[in-house]
Amino acid sequence: GFGHTRLEGPAVDSYWFPDYMADLDALLDHYAGERKVDLVGHSMGGNIAMMYAGVRPQRIEHLVNLEGFGMPETRPAQAPGRYAQWMDEIKTVQRGGKALKSYADADGVARRLMKTNPRLSEDKAQWLAQHWARPNAQGLWEILGDPAHKITSAQLYRVDEALAIYERITAPALAREASGDSL
């Protein structure tokens, strides 16, 4: 997550989607042991929750998916271009080209959040800004994210594979999609 999982060590070039499921598995091992859990995910987290619930159905009591409905279908012919794009984006990140924007203060972060989501109230944006960013050594507020998350995956999304995993979900599931579009 943002801000609470920073580790010292070498930078990561990119992330592989199954790593997120393995991270979730480790978190559940640590915090829930053998107990079943209620799992809620939003957007990419909803995709992770759905995949995890199908791969480890015995661990999930209830599943809530908020706007995590997979990705567009891909075709094998897209693979060469996708791998080239992935390699190019890794080089860009290594040169600092995908660095996350810095802000003069927490208010700037809050304004950025409200611009992205006009329905977000100022008090909620201020609260999020304090948890989503922190000041660096120069006093600028940096988003607590890893630019490597912005890299396009080299792997193509396989809808048939995802559907086969979804078929294994045994927990009662609730899926929700927003009715408004603020973009």
For each of these PLM feature ranges, what is it?
Residues 1, 7, 68, 178-180:
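Active-site loop/turn elements of alpha/beta-hydrolase fold enzymes
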Residues 1-40:
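Active-site loop/oxyanion-hole signature of alpha/beta-hydrolase fold enzymes
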Residues 19-27, 51, 108, 112, ...:
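Alpha-helical elements of Rossmann-like donor-binding domains used by nucleotide-donor carbohydrate transfer enzymes
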Residues 34-80:
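Conserved hydrolase catalytic core segment
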Residues 66-101:
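A catalytic-pocket lid/entrance helix-loop region that shapes and gates access to the active site
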Residues 94-99, 108-120, 131-133, 150-154:
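Helix-loop "lid/cap" segments that line or gate small-molecule binding pockets
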Residues 133-183:
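Conserved serine/cysteine hydrolase catalytic core
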